[in-house]
Structure formats: structure tokens, C-alpha cells
A protein has these predicted regions:
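N-terminal signal peptide c-region/cleavage motif recognized by signal peptidases
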Residues: 15-17
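Bacterial N-terminal signal peptides that target proteins for export
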Residues: 1-10
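PEST-like low-complexity, intrinsically disordered acidic/proline/serine-rich tracts
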Residues: 2, 19-245
Length: 245
């Protein structure tokens, strides 16, 4: 991936705008049971107003517990709060964004196949996610972590379904500060539309935080000529106050 694209992507993300264009015409047919390659967000124009920061134009249905937590969030989206006043854990402490918030970072990710699991390599902060494909069930009492424990399986030849549980409660669901608890369950349906295009259908469920499942769909484009670069949560990375003006 060309490094001169990174400042532009960063500016879009922290201004609350996604790199959004209408998907181009269909390409060759999707390969069977294969997501390998580097993917970059490419959402349609009607999602432009929100998809860089949250899942839907409408607010999710929050429980009273989550409503109180959400009121405490001081996000930096569109400069509402500055670097000196935000309490966004990613910005203030370099905490991992976790799943699903990692999708709101404006950087690509790569799928790598192995015999026992599918790896997701996110360009942001060297994040590596392991999705087990060896037939194990979704754990009922997992150790808590930033990325949770992910188990995946194929439905047909073009849809890969991932269930993730076991999150700690230190992350936000999105850049706006919607909270979650350790009961969060994230379902992702990765559907290979054709050779060059993929959509992810999200279902977020959390009985402590969400009064109803939160659903959304994001779109991605294959970038066969790109290579993942190095984006670290460092002092240089955090110096984006110019994007908040």
C-alpha cells in the first residue's frame, strides 16, 4: 500500500468520514471458500455521513445501564472533544480498539488462511486476530480479551460466518462511545460478492448494553497490489489535532 495514502485516510477517519464511493461494476465470480487478500473499506455514498464513526444513522437501542455509560463518553469525532478533553480509550491510552471498533480505523486488513484458523491482520497497530476453523464450538466461559475468542465456519461457498465472545469491557463499540459489557456477542457474516468485492453483515448482541440487536452492513474492495504497512499507536500517530478543526 502506498504510504502517501495514509494521511488522507487518517484525515477522513478522524473527521468522521469514510472513504466512500459507489462500488464499481461486478468483477469475476467469487472464488469458493476463499477470503485471502487485502481488503479496504468502500462504502456507498448513502453511508458517508456515519460509516466512518458508527454502524447506523439511527442510534442503537440502549439499556438504561448503557445510556448512562454513553453519556459519560467524550468522543473526538468531528472535534466534539479535543485531544485534551476526550476520554476515548484508544486516543488517551493507546488501548486496542477491539472488535468491532477496529473496522472504524481507516486502514486495510488482510486474510491469511492456515489449516486450523483464519488470520485477520489489521494494518492498524499490528493487530492480529485468530478465527478458529477447526470445528470447535463457541466457548461458553472464555477468558476475556480485547479481541475476544472467534470461531468461524462456511455457509455455502461464499459466506464465512464468525461468532466472537469473551470481550473485556474496556473498549467502545464505535468511535462515538457506545459501550458494551463482557456479555457482548459479535456475529460477522463475510460474504464474497465477487472476486473484488465483499460485504460484512454485523449483528451485535449484548443483554446488558443493547435492548435490541444492533445490525449493519459494511462493504469492502480487494486491493491485490497493496501490501500492509506499519501503523503504530505512538506519539506521532496521536498528533492529529489538525483533523479536529
Amino acid at each position: 500500500m502506498s504510504r502517501n495514502l495514509i494521511p488522507a485516510f487518517a484525515a477522513l477517519a478522524f473527521a468522521g468520514v469514510v472513504c466512500a464511493q459507489a462500488p464499481p461494476a461486478a468483477s469475476a465470480p467469487a472464488p469458493k471458500r476463499d477470503l485471502t487478500g487485502i481488503w479496504m473499506a468502500r462504502n456507498p455514498p448513502n453511508m458517508r455521513a456515519y460509516a466512518g464513526a458508527t454502524f447506523t444513522k439511527e442510534e442503537p437501542e440502549l439499556t438504561p445501564w448503557a445510556q448512562a455509560k454513553y453519556k459519560e463518553a467524550k468522543n473526538s469525532n468531528n472535534g466534539i472533544y479535543t485531544l485534551d478533553t476526550t476520554n476515548d480509550p484508544v486516543i488517551t491510552h493507546c488501548d486496542p480498539p477491539g472488535v468491532p471498533r477496529v473496522y472504524f480505523h481507516p486502514y486495510p486488513f488482510e486474510f491469511v488462511n492456515t489449516p486450523k484458523y483464519l488470520l485477520m491482520l489489521y494494518e492498524y497497530d499490528h493487530t492480529v486476530r485468530r478465527i478458529f476453523t477447526d470445528g470447535r464450538p463457541v466457548p461458553t466461559d472464555p477468558d476475556l480479551s480485547w479481541l475476544g475468542t472467534s470461531v468461524g465456519h462456511w455457509e455455502g461457498d461464499t459466506t464465512f460466518v464468525v461468532e466472537t465472545v469473551g470481550f473485556n469491557d474496556k473498549t467502545w463499540l464505535d468511535r462515538l462511545g457506545h459501550p458494551h459489557s463482557t456479555e457482548l456477542r459479535v456475529t460477522e457474516r463475510f460474504r464474497r460478492i465477487d472476486m473484488d468485492h465483499m460485504q460484512i453483515d454485523f449483528i451485535l448482541q449484548d443483554p446488558k448494553a443493547l435492548a435490541a440487536p444492533w445490525k449493519s452492513t459494511f462493504y469492502f474492495e480487494l486491493r491485490p497490489k497493496w501490501e500492509l504497512g506499519e501503523i503504530s499507536c505512538s506519539g506521532d500517530y496521536l498528533g492529529f489535532s489538525k483533523f479536529e478543526k
